[in-house]
Amino acid sequence: MEEKDSCYHVPVMLRESLEGLDIRPDGIYVDVTFGGGGHSREILKRLGSEGELYGFDQDADAEHNVPADPRFTFVRSNFRYLYNFMRYYGESGEVDGLLADLGVSSHHFDDKDRGFSFRFDGTLDMRMNTRAGQTAADIVNNYTAEALADVFYLYGELKVSRKLASVLVKARETKKIETIGDFLEVIKPFTGKDKEKKFLAQVFQALRIEVNDEMRALKEMLRSTLRVLRPGGRLVVITYHSLEDRLVKNFLKTGNFEGKCEQDFFGNVRSPFRLVNNKVIVPTDEEVERNPRSRSAKLRIAEKV
């Protein structure tokens, strides 16, 4: 099981995450990004017989990694429904700590049939939940030029978003874009030799975020933590790109996504959280060397007041 999980996804900043949760043996914890179960298994090692852990994941593949442990409950769902499920289990307002590792797992990147990586040819899919929702191919073939440009600009931060969208719309008039190979062939003129990987990463990130409605889902999950965590409960979040990190940073600091500071009568900043680490935590050089995919990770820890 351990070997299989290490292939599925290597837990990023594992030690720092566990320290951030400040685990109590009899506590109630939630891993909203279960994936390969690496973080969850380490949390279980630190829980006593009365402790409880809930793991969320919308991907059916993650169920193969569920530990046979009576203290663990697997929730096959998008983490945007965190509050609904924790209320169902009678744990709303009782949770001692919540972990969210927002990165795409190695399992997804390395499975050519899932369509997350430009390294392989395969179906242009990118759905985390393969049973529902539109695929990346659906978006590329059906969105208007304006809608496509918005996706590439807002989620990929691409300056050539309008030109890129226009080329895609024109290309699909001749032939439907169904595979990663089809897609790469169309956008080839935009990929400069020096920054090809960076450009493609931005394009694929934009499509993935749109396919899975990631930014809205993240906002809903973060709002839910206000009702799920008990006072003193810890929120530990690992981000991988500037869009999600900005949301998390603002939310933990101010309680909203715009970063607007609200003050009380005495001029003190009002926030539902107290920052545990004022400075963002990043992987050590040793971890990055061991796991290059951790390079862009940022860890933030806060405590509900």
From Swiss-Prot:
<keyword id="KW-0949">S-adenosyl-L-methionine</keyword>
<dbReference type="InterPro" id="IPR029063">
    <property type="entry name" value="SAM-dependent_MTases_sf"/>
</dbReference>
<dbReference type="GO" id="GO:0005737">
    <property type="term" value="C:cytoplasm"/>
</dbReference>
<keyword id="KW-0963">Cytoplasm</keyword>
<feature type="binding site">
    <location>
        <position position="85"/>
    </location>
    <ligand>
        <name>S-adenosyl-L-methionine</name>
    </ligand>
</feature>
<keyword id="KW-0489">Methyltransferase</keyword>
<dbReference type="GO" id="GO:0071424">
    <property type="term" value="F:rRNA (cytosine-N4-)-methyltransferase activity"/>
</dbReference>
<keyword id="KW-0698">rRNA processing</keyword>
<dbReference type="InterPro" id="IPR002903">
    <property type="entry name" value="RsmH"/>
</dbReference>
<feature type="binding site">
    <location>
        <position position="101"/>
    </location>
    <ligand>
        <name>S-adenosyl-L-methionine</name>
    </ligand>
</feature>
<dbReference type="Pfam" id="PF01795">
    <property type="entry name" value="Methyltransf_5"/>
</dbReference>
<feature type="binding site">
    <location>
        <position position="57"/>
    </location>
    <ligand>
        <name>S-adenosyl-L-methionine</name>
    </ligand>
</feature>
<keyword id="KW-0808">Transferase</keyword>
<feature type="binding site">
    <location>
        <begin position="37"/>
        <end position="39"/>
    </location>
    <ligand>
        <name>S-adenosyl-L-methionine</name>
    </ligand>
</feature>
<comment type="similarity">
    <text>Belongs to the methyltransferase superfamily. RsmH family.</text>
</comment>
<dbReference type="GO" id="GO:0070475">
    <property type="term" value="P:rRNA base methylation"/>
</dbReference>
<dbReference type="InterPro" id="IPR023397">
    <property type="entry name" value="SAM-dep_MeTrfase_MraW_recog"/>
</dbReference>
<comment type="function">
    <text>Specifically methylates the N4 position of cytidine in position 1402 (C1402) of 16S rRNA.</text>
</comment>
<protein>
    <recommendedName>
        <fullName>Ribosomal RNA small subunit methyltransferase H</fullName>
        <ecNumber>2.1.1.199</ecNumber>
    </recommendedName>
</protein>
<feature type="binding site">
    <location>
        <position position="108"/>
    </location>
    <ligand>
        <name>S-adenosyl-L-methionine</name>
    </ligand>
</feature>
